[in-house]
Regions:
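Active-site catalytic pocket residues across diverse enzymes, especially alpha/beta-hydrolases
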Residues: 20, 105-106
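C-terminal capping/extension of enzyme domains
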Residues: 6-8, 15, 62-79, 106-169
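Secondary-structure transition/hinge residues
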Residues: 20, 24, 86, 159-162
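Secondary-structure boundary/capping signal
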Residues: 24-25, 89-90, 110
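Internal catalytic-core helix/loop-beta-alpha segment
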Residues: 46-105
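Short, surface-exposed acidic-centric catalytic microdomains
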Residues: 2-70
Length: 169
């Protein structure tokens, strides 16, 4: 896998296009059924969005990518990741497995969190917010525009929308 969310049917990059540009195809290369990775990477760096996995290695127990069919072989160093990102104020764990691994690691009780909610936790003396957002997978039954509304609200809450200028890309 070359990069995050490589599956053309996954909506993560369409969600970001809608949130920041009002254009779900902003990062989509329709002709090649892929994404404009160079532009996407520049955008993420400019805005201050980091992406990482909660698992470094997984084993697929069936032919699907469903969380229930993944066996964790090696977890990521979440503490090391947050230490490497001292300005990080918010985290989205996309998917049930990632959420479970993250909340278990930090002792967060996320059972009562509804879609769009966040809960704060303290890490190395700073407050970090864990956001519960809809999965970007098309298997998650929600319209793309509705998913983008949740994500945009989070980006606004974290101050990323206010500092973003679309003309810089």
């Amino acid at each position: 896998m070359d990069w995050y969310y490589p599956n053309y049917t996954n909506d993560m990059w369409r969600i970001l296009g809608l949130c920041f540009f009002g254009d779900k195809l902003r990062f989509v290369d329709e002709a090649h059924k892929t994404y404009r990775l160079d532009e996407l990477k520049r955008f993420l760096e400019e805005v201050g969005i980091a992406i990482y996995d909660t698992c470094l290695r997984v084993r697929r127990t069936t032919g699907t990518a469903s969380d229930k069919d993944l066996e964790v072989v090696e977890r990521a160093d979440l503490d090391g990741l947050l230490r490497a990102l001292p300005q990080c104020r918010g985290v989205v764990a996309a998917g049930q497995l990632a959420t479970s691994l993250f909340t278990d690691h930090y002792g967060i009780d996320a059972r009562t969190m509804r879609m769009g909610d966040h809960c704060d936790f303290t890490f190395d003396g700073r407050t970090v917010s864990l956001y519960r957002q809809p999965s970007s997978s098309r298997a998650f039954p929600m319209r793309l525009e509705q998913k983008a509304t949740y994500y945009k609200s989070m980006f606004e809450d974290l101050g990323l929308m206010a500092s973003w200028r679309p003309d810089i890309l």
